[in-house]
Amino acid sequence: AIFTEAKQNGQFRAFWKTFDESVNLMASGEVVIQSMWSPAITAVKSRGIPCVYQPLEEGYRSWGGGIGLSKSLSGMELDAAYEYINWYLSGWVGGFLMRQGYYSAVPETSKDFMSENEWGYWFEGKEATDVITSPTGDVLAQAGEVRDGGSFEERMGAVACWNAVMDENQYM
C-alpha cells in the first residue's frame, strides 16, 4: 500500500514485472535509477548505453541458487542427475553466468572457460586489458574500464541481505 500510494503521487515511474521491462525502462531513458539485476545492466550496456550497477552504502542485495536432487532418484536417473550437476559446476556455465555479472557456486572452475582479461575484469575487479563482451558478443566494457563494485571478494563481502524465493512464489 505504501509503494502504491507513492507511485500514485509520482514517486515511481513504474514497477517492472519482467527482466525486459527493467531493461527497456532504463534503455529508453524513462527512468534513471532503479533496482536491476546484474544481467539487466549487461543488457543495457550491450545497447551502447552507459549504465552503472551502483553499490549501496548499506551493502548489496544478493540471491543464491542451488540444485537439489529428489530422494526418489535411483539408478540411471540418479547417475544422470549427478552427471548434470558435475557438468553445471565444471565451469562452462559459470563462465557464461559471469559474463552477465553473476557468479557460479564454484567460480574458480569458470576460469578455464574465460580469458585472462575476462577473469580479471569479472572476478578480480581489475581493469580490462581489452574489450569485454557479453555471452552473445555484445561489447560491455572497453580496455581500462573496471567492473562496478570491484572484485568478487569486495562484492560478496558487502552483501547485506540474501534474498530467497518466498513461500508465496508458487502462487504468483
Give short role names for the model-derived ranges:
Residues I49-R61, S72:
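Short beta-strand->loop
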Residues G65-I67:
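Short amphipathic alpha-helical segments
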Residues A1-Q54:
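Ligand-binding pocket segment of bilobal, Venus flytrap-like solute-binding proteins
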Residues K7-Q11, A27, V31, N86-G94, ...:
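Sec-exported extracytoplasmic/periplasmic mature domains
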Residues T133-M172:
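Conserved C-terminal helix/tail region of periplasmic/extracytoplasmic solute-binding proteins
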Residues K17-D20, S35, G75-D79, G149-M156:
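Soluble non-cytosolic domains of exported or imported proteins
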Residues S70-Q142:
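Mature extracytoplasmic/periplasmic domains
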Residues S38-T42, E58-R61, G91-W92:
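Solvent-exposed loop/turn segments at secondary-structure junctions
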